[in-house]
Amino acid sequence: MTLKNKTILVTGSEGFTGKVLLSLLKNNGAKVFSTGLSQKVDKFYYQCDLANEKCVINMIEEINPDEIYHLAGSFSNDFYIDLESNLITTRNILESVYKLRKKSRILLIGSSAEYGSIKHGDNPISELHSLNPTSMYGLTKIFQTYLMKLYVELHGLDVVMARVFNLNGKGISDKLFIGNLYKQIKDLKSNKIKEILLGNINNERDYISVNNAVIAYIKIMKNGITGEIYNVGSGKPEKIECVLNQILKEEEISKNVVKTNCKPNMKYDVKTIFANINKLKKLG
């Protein structure tokens, strides 16, 4: 894989996945610009509030990117926060590329939360499965999906989407199960807490390493068909308890300090969900 002569913009570059993507793109010869809210001196970094359309227009006009990876977003489940982070920022990027008449190819990050409540027999879930969100986060991601389709169909923008299942890796946001587990392990080792409190660990999810997910993003950016959505996952279910045991073993933590079912069950807690990744595999 070579990306020489490519100018690429990555949003959400200060997140764990963004850092992994930045490193891989740079190592393959791309000229990579990143953006975030923090202040730092770097000619390849732009401090920009993506919810501010003027800021986004100025940034894209100056960088003139061949490709844009839009990784920035939130999963707070607060409607207004997620609406701004997941929808308004996306709209500003798409609108800026349209207004500036840029030819940038854009990759958006969707979520398996868009599928929401499913039946066990529906697995593996394909991109054609109905969307039944059970969270504000999932709902705003569906809005993002339809926004993509609108800009592709009405304005001819070159946009593709990676619909991501569960990411696995040290450094992931502590709002996700694995990130929260690592945070509690860190607190346990520093004697801030005496035990690790978790919810239901009997459900099955589709976990993919951050490294493999990022490779899939690049593949979709390179070979994906404009306007199409591609599931990104391992394509197989894994019991949350197995993931827990693996991490505890790696961190040399006894399972005796773990207390489960300490958090209220969600009304629409899905027992098993995993991706059909045949469409992604066809990209090579």
Which functions belong to the PLM regions below?
Residues I8-N27:
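N-terminal Rossmann NAD(P)H-binding glycine-rich loop of SDR-like oxidoreductase domains
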Residues T11, T35, I68-A72, I106-S112, ...:
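SDR active-site strand-loop-helix element
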Residues I118-H120, Y146-R205, V210-I218, P237, ...:
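NAD(P)-dependent short-chain dehydrogenase/reductase
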Residues Q39-N52:
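Rossmann-fold cofactor-recognition segment
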Residues I196, N200, I229-Y230, E238-N245, ...:
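C-terminal "lid/loop" region of Rossmann-like NAD(P)-dependent oxidoreductases
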Residues M136-F143:
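Active-site helix of classical SDR
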Residues L50-N86:
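NAD(P)H-binding glycine-rich loop region in Rossmannoid oxidoreductase-like domains
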Residues H70, N92-S135:
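Conserved Rossmann-fold NAD(P)-dependent oxidoreductase catalytic core, especially the SDR/UDP-sugar
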